[in-house]
Amino acid sequence: MTRIAFAVALAVAALLRLDDALAQAAFPPPPPKVSPAAGVIDMHVHSHPDVFGRNMDDLDVAQLAKARGMRGIVLKNHISETASRAALVMKVVPGIEVFGGIVLNTAVGGINPSAVEWMHRIYGGRGKVVWLPTFESDKHVKTFTGPNAKGLTVAPNGQVTPEMEAILQIVARENLVLATGHVHPEEVVAVVRRGRELGVKNMLVTHGFTSVPGLNMAQAKEVADMGALIEVCFLQFLAGPNAPLPFLTHWTQINAKHVAQAAKEIGAKSLLISSDLGQSANMTHPDGIEAAVGQLKKEGIADADIETMLRKNPARMLGLDG
């Protein structure tokens, strides 16, 4: 190549680079995609170690949630406390809030104030949520086993038991979150009422509209008026006769249409959406959150209401905003 030809080639290359720069300025590339799960706090996360099949362990969940921009997760286990696990995960996966708690099934002594007292004292201060009995509650075993089955109760005849009273006092004193588990809807109302009287600030009705506890709208309005939030879990979007997982075929489906109706009747300010995911062969927690957001938007629920249900309400319950 002659010197003249080489100079022409350089000039052409420079012009091409200039054209490319001008094009980039006129038509800049789109901004990086932001996950619909960004900033969300999932207050209902199942993971290994567990006695039930799970698709990820605590570290996997935290790392994936962080990578998708989520603000935090709450680890839930039906048979053991998760405050200690949350504290360790926080050390290994910085940059995401991880909390735990305790579910009051028989493995921890049932309705056991001592278990709650020790849980919230565990090193790291990550023990935040106290769930009432789940698969061993009287409501759960009667619903899925039969009417003659008997399980744990917290407020027979509409009055909380002495043990339940003591637990509410601890929750109020330590500013924990009281989640109602799978107890009877009448027990939910009684516990929320007594909790309010004792000064419990943060009460969450665990997946309130599905099979357990199965609140009707009047009961939902009653507890919402007393300051409780009602949880809706994406897992229940997947439930019903055509559910992808066999155990979900026995649960009542609660989907985005139900959320839209509840938001109209009691307000998004009284609702909280989480995943309740982690089961073997099920989708990941962030995928579930993203799917939930998509379905809520498709149903016409306002972005501001989605922000309230998935970000603001969980943050307030966990003491992350003020």
Each language-model region and where it sits:
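Histidine/acidic residue-rich metal-binding segments in metalloenzymes
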Residues: 27, 58-63, 83-88, 94, ...
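Hydrophobic faces of well-ordered beta-strands that scaffold small-molecule active sites
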Residues: 41-45, 73-75, 99-102, 130-132, ...
